[in-house]
Regions:
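Active-site-adjacent loop/helix segments that line or gate small-molecule/cofactor pockets in enzymes
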Residues: 15-55
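Glycine-rich loop-to-alpha-helix module at the N-terminal edge of alpha/beta enzyme cores
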Residues: 68-149
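PLP-dependent aspartate aminotransferase-fold enzymes
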Residues: 114-218, 340-343
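Active-site core of PLP-dependent enzymes with the aminotransferase class I/II
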Residues: 203, 209, 221-247
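Active-site PLP attachment segment
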Residues: 270-299, 311-318
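Structural signature of PLP-dependent enzymes
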Residues: 323-344
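PLP-dependent enzyme catalytic core of the Aspartate aminotransferase-like
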Residues: 327-329, 337, 388-448
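Conserved PLP-binding catalytic core of the aspartate aminotransferase-like
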Residues: 340-344, 350-383, 399, 433-448
């Protein structure tokens, strides 16, 4: 029997396993245990974090063991702004499934969605689709390279797992400064070294230097993440792109529709050459879109960009329904309100209990942290104890339309009980001894 073969006696039925048993099995069958790094239990509280769900509705989750939680974490990394299993989106998807989600012909929803996206973004003329953020960004980079006949890319921020992006780490650990540390470029061709050039958000001089000394096909950047830009920064980026004939690509995969119906770039007054959407555009169903100006997007016809499941009917149906709901509800205002409420009360709680609690970033993508040398232990203890109180909690809170003031206040009340223990643990210097689980991980690490 080879190493990869599984004895028949070990092939247990997954529906008979609890959360921890199933995750241990997953680690044997799936490299890394999960498909998304941010869903690894090791990123929260190893051995106690519920890896699997049975039901998810609104902002509540029932795990595989039947326990009910209010999700006060990142809510699937902000993918479901309307809340889990939104009835309007689900109804549109169910209608498409019943009518057939895939066949030899194309779904007319592709055209309706394209019309809707171009209507929302007057600067854009054309649309291409994919089903995930990383691949949509790769499409945008391919189109930019085809349009300019150039190879190099300037970027800032986090842009996924693709070769074009991870090539930045072939010369050293530079991507750790752009959100996620530990991104080893194993498997990325060494020939891509020197094709991508990172710059820090807000550092216009660094970008100017890149453009002066190289010939980038595109500037790829998030419009914002942890803070709003300083006056003149985005305008300066736009000017540099225009002067150098470089395609400006705005990555809205994370910022998405959280700050404005149509994307953060619209709130900030910047008109790119291309914008990329995923996650929030379809409220939990696989869908992504690249929109852009016709003189750039036309280049997609000169390069082979094609895939069968980019034509399924579910993604466009979900996206149309999601966008319609966002047009009818002021989602950004609600996210701002709920996030700001949580950040304010988190900071006040820290002051009340003399715990080094710190709220950072923007309300729609808030970070609720501990400013302490043992902050990883604190977070692990906090997450473990909040599970006992019926809350999924990590180091960030991405609110949804389903969250109410009652959800936020209930979370803060429960956190106050846990802060009492954290305060005592700091005073007694016994944080580690209180943990019944390994300390949480940060960044990308191999699971042994």
């Amino acid at each position: 029997m080879t190493q990869l073969e599984i004895p028949a006696s070990d092939k247990q039925h997954t529906n008979a396993m609890n959360n921890q048993q199933l995750y241990e099995r997953a680690r044997q069958l799936i490299p890394g245990g999960t498909q998304l790094l941010s869903k690894r239990p090791e990123m929260f509280a190893p051995d106690v974090w519920p890896a699997y769900y049975r039901e998810a509705k609104g902002c509540e989750i029932v795990d595989l063991d039947g326990r009910r939680f209010v999700d006060m974490s990142t809510n699937c990394v902000g993918a479901c702004l309307l809340g889990y299993a939104n009835e309007h989106v689900n109804q549109a998807v169910q209608q498409r499934v019943q009518s057939g989600s895939m066949c030899t012909l194309n779904s007319p929803d592709e055209v309706e969605l394209a019309e809707l996206l171009v209507e929302l973004h007057p600067w854009a003329d054309m649309v291409r689709y994919a089903r995930a953020g990383g691949e949509a960004l790769s499409i945008a980079v391919r189109i930019a390279r085809a349009a300019t006949r150039r190879d190099q890319i300037a970027f800032c921020g986090y842009h996924g797992w693709s070769d074009w992006y991870l090539a930045a780490n072939l010369s050293g650990e530079v991507l750790g400064e752009h959100l996620l540390a530990g991104l080893d470029p194993a498997g990325v061709p060494r020939g891509l070294d020197g094709t991508v050039f990172p710059f820090q958000y807000g550092d216009l001089d660094a970008l100017r230097e890149i453009v002066r000394n190289n010939t980038p096909a595109a500037i790829v950047m998030e419009p914002l993440r942890q803070r709003y830009p300083e006056p003149g920064f985005l305008e300066g980026v736009r000017q540099l792109a225009d002067e150098s004939g470089t395609v400006l690509v705005i990555d809205e995969v994370s910022s998405g529709w959280k700050f404005h119906c149509g994307g953060a770039h619209m709130k900030l007054g910047i008109e790119p050459d291309m914008a990329v959407f995923a996650k929030t555009i379809s409220n939990g169903y696989p869908m992504s879109a690249v929109i852009g100006r016709s003189h750039v997007m036309d280049a997609a016809q000169t390069s082979f960009i094609s895939s069968t499941y980019w034509t399924d009917g579910i993604g466009p149906a979900a996206a149309i329904a999601t966008i319609r709901q966002m047009q009818q509800n002021d989602v950004p205002a609600h996210l701002e309100s709920m996030g700001a409420r949580a950040m304010k009360k988190w900071t006040e709680l820290g002051q009340q209990y003399d715990v080094p609690a710190q709220a950072a970033s923007l309300p729609a993508m808030s970070a609720l942290k501990f400013d302490h040398p043992q902050q990883l232990m604190m977070h692990t203890l906090f997450t473990s104890r909040m599970l006992d109180r019926g809350y999924l909690a990590g180091s960030g809170f991405f609110p949804t339309l389903a969250h109410t003031e009652q959800h936020v206040d209930g979370f803060i009340d429960a956190a106050g009980e846990v802060f009492t223990e954290i305060r005592d643990a700091i005073a007694n210097d016994d944080l580690e001894s209180r943990l019944k689980t390994p300390v949480r991980q940060t960044g990308f690490q191999r699971l042994t």
